[in-house]
Amino acid sequence: LTPSRSKFLRALNDYRRLCLGQSCPRHRPLAGMELRLCRDLLVRVLGPSRAQAEKLASSCRALYEEADPSAFWQRLDQLDAAMNNYSLILLLEYRGTRILLPGDTNHMGYGGLAPASLQADLFKVGHHGQRDGISAEQIQAIAPRAVVCCASSDRRYNSADPAILQMMADSGARLYFSDCPPGPDGAVPPPHQALTFTVGAGGAMEGTYLSIPD
């Protein structure tokens, strides 16, 4: 059992136990749904589509029902390779500011979405900013003023790919990081305990690194 298989199978089993053990209502957000979480805050579900959700459910059932060990591992590997693009894609709107949160989606996971639906002021790039995280055409459609990349400073798994960061910087977006990898210009964000964004009316938006207490 490889470390990759072990990690993914453990995650699936943990999630399955969580679902089976909860007695509270469970909701399945699908593309097209709108949720008003509070005054002035609207959440639109862009993905996954109903067809994608059903395909994922079918793949999971087939995996757990598979009796042949060889076929089981093959199904597991196929599901692992595809799982990121079943991520929940959310568009938040607050007082004129749009925030796009694509989960772990890479550039292949936006298929079927109208480019106009992706436009956002703040964009959290998917797949930790790996090279396949977003395409030039998608960045053009999103046209973000600011981009957040959640990546470790040691760039494990090739996260915060320099070419992707340069492409987003060239689009005119300001880059922010949850950790401290260098940006395309070589500048390193200050050490910080958190990254916050303050969003106000009329598109007002400011990103701030919260310093580490002495």
Please report, for each region that a protein language model flagged, where it lies by residue.
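Flexible, acidic/histidine-containing loops and adjacent segments that form or flank the divalent-metal
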Residues: L1-L100, A173-R174, S178-P181, D185-D214
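Short amphipathic alpha-helical segments and helix-helix/interface helices
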Residues: L9-R16, G111-A114, A136-I139, P162-M168
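Active-site-proximal loop/helix segments of hydrolase catalytic cores
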Residues: Q52-A160
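Active-site-proximal loop/helix of nucleotide/amide-processing enzymes and allied scaffolds
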Residues: I142, S159-S171, C180
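A general structural signal for short secondary-structure boundary/capping elements
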Residues: C150-A151, D170-G172
